[in-house]
Amino acid sequence: MNHTPLIQAATQTLIDHVDELTALDQAIGDGDHGLNMRRGAQAIQAKMDVLSTQSLNEALKTMGMTCMSTIGGSSGPVFGTLLVTLAKELPAQPTSADLARALDAGIKALTRLGKAEVGQKTLLDVLDPVRQLLAAAGDLNGAELLARVRQCADDSVLATAQMEAGRGRSSFLGERALGHVDPGSRSMALIISSICDRL
């Protein structure tokens, strides 16, 4: 599998949606999520020559370390930890079951990192439903599975609007955060959808 087009698509969608992500974060956070994610995406794109020569696992680790060093706020460690964990867990040619197991490891790593849990208005609320879908995929063919994953990610983002935040700056808002989707969840869904579109 050539991962370079997937990386290009995922990073470009974050750059293209910077204004949306900024607006989402201005509503319930400190307003810098979009700019931080764009900075990380641009830093990854600047390494495309290196990433294109690396294996999937090496590229995931490189991107994870890049996120940690370039993305400000909590998003750098969060997305960096997720990518580094996936680098350790994924085989070179992952199946849907492999992806589910790797996401499970990533969710556990993020829970240890930030003490967040599913249902607390974080990107875990996108990752976990997608993990469950992949784990139960069975004999779904590629096109149908990709469509379901994309829809699951989009639906899961919308569901965060009905959650009170348990972690991060938005947790101080309590019920005032209701009605607003989580910016990190939206970023995660954008990444997932862009990858599905290119597979």
Label every model-predicted segment.
Residues 1-199:
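N-terminal loops that bind phosphate or other acidic moieties
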